[in-house]
Amino acid sequence: MLYFKNQWMPGDGRSFKSINPLNGEVIWEGNFASNKQLNAVVKSASQAHLGWAHQSLVKRLSVIKKFYRLLDKNKETMTRLISLETGKIPADAASEVGAALAKLNNSVLAYKKRTGSQLDSLESMTASLEHSSHGVLSVIGPFNFPLHLPNGHITPALLAGNTIVFKPSESTPMVAEYTMLLWSQAGLPDGVINLAHGGKDVVRALCKHPTNKGILFTGSYAVGKQLSKIMADYPEKILALELGGNNPMVVWSTRKINAAADLIFESAFISSGQRCTCARRLILPNTKDGKKILERLKKKIKALSFVSPEDLYYGPLISSKATDEFLKFQEKLLALGAKTILKAKKVKGAFNLVTPSLINVQGMTKLFDEENFGPMLQVSFVDTFQGAIDLANNTKFGLAAGLISDNQTLFKPFVQAVNAGIINLNSTTTGASGAFPFGGIGRSGNLRPAGFYAADYCAWPKASIIKKL
């Protein structure tokens, strides 16, 4: 269903389905927005903009807070929908809802700190700074965090006075529609937030629509590159890209074998590796301790149970296509000279559930620098800490990196040298603070980080000099 002007309407475009990735059952059916409907959705957002933007921050915030109260009240329902539609285990789905609920306070603080008003009185003049909303912003959501990541754009955009067209992932329409239901119950004025299902054609149309002022996208580098090409014709529009990573986890100078293996395991395999910050590459010292860590990691992987849903550490990959691409990626690595430590395979009777892949890439003839969205870890051994840093940087991505070490003095040179936007010590690569920016460099984005800095691309500054005649 489409949602605009506070009304629900069936789409007139191509039909599509949401499929439970664990068992293959069809759990939702609907249609994309037609071109005519999409124009109506954008018009709805445009007509609502000035009325929303001219409300005081206090009034806008009161409605937004009501949405968060409703989300908290209905968090069990949201958790169930996320788990059903993405395949996440319930604890992982509940964690996403918790992360979304924590977004409000950080967004308000960021708005006031980074895009609020400011007055500086000097001897002969006053300098004034205000911020204005852009207008209609289109949020293109991902499947892996269908609530939390779109919400990371939507909340700061609404706070700043923008109106929203939300185009969710085709894999998670139920979560999107329930999110819209809660926003409607919160009492947002008609047209302030709108929902349009669709695929590439809908996204392309939103990019080119004259009334749409920006695209806030979370997803793969390949799609982000396509969006950049389209938006090159519209340099006056905002484009914020939150893309993927080929993230390294470096282990150096630690005797805590079990603790290191636990951090590596969670970094690589949480959410079946379907987080942009998951560790993709493990860089170990070429020592006895390095080999002990690898052996401990192998034991943890082999101990995983895939017998029943209640036993799962992680859920399935999002689709049959994703599963096929994951397994093909594994074969590509092996064809290039990588060696199997533990080979991933599909779990019988579980549709898109796969076992983890542990691959030694030491002898590869050519590095394959791509983000592989699944439970795979590529293992390398190095002789020096500088060699570990060099290998960590041997990627065109730059989202997340981690260092595990008993020697904390190594962290400062690691942070200074490693090209990534999120760098953690003795923590998972997937850990990030909502009070800081979230983003990377290179193929991981276009230097418009989300998180605390999302406020920056949701408003534009007006600087004034005020003098007396």
Summary of predicted features, one role per range:
Residues 1-125:
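N-terminal Rossmann-like NAD(P)+-binding subdomain of aldehyde/semialdehyde dehydrogenases
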Residues 22-29, 212, 250, 346, ...:
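Conserved C-terminal structural/oligomerization subdomain of aldehyde/semialdehyde dehydrogenase
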Residues 24, 60, 82, 104, ...:
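Residue-level signal for inorganic ion chemistry
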Residues 27-33, 48-54, 138-139, 249-252, ...:
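Short, well-ordered beta-strand elements within core beta-sheets of diverse protein domains
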Residues 49, 53, 68-75, 79, ...:
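Structural signal for hydrophobic packing residues in well-ordered secondary-structure cores
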Residues 116-259, 287, 382:
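Rossmann-like NAD(P) dinucleotide-binding subdomain of oxidoreductase/dehydrogenase enzymes
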Residues 163-165, 340, 422:
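A short hydrophobic/small-residue beta-strand
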Residues 223-362, 425:
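ALDH superfamily catalytic-core signature
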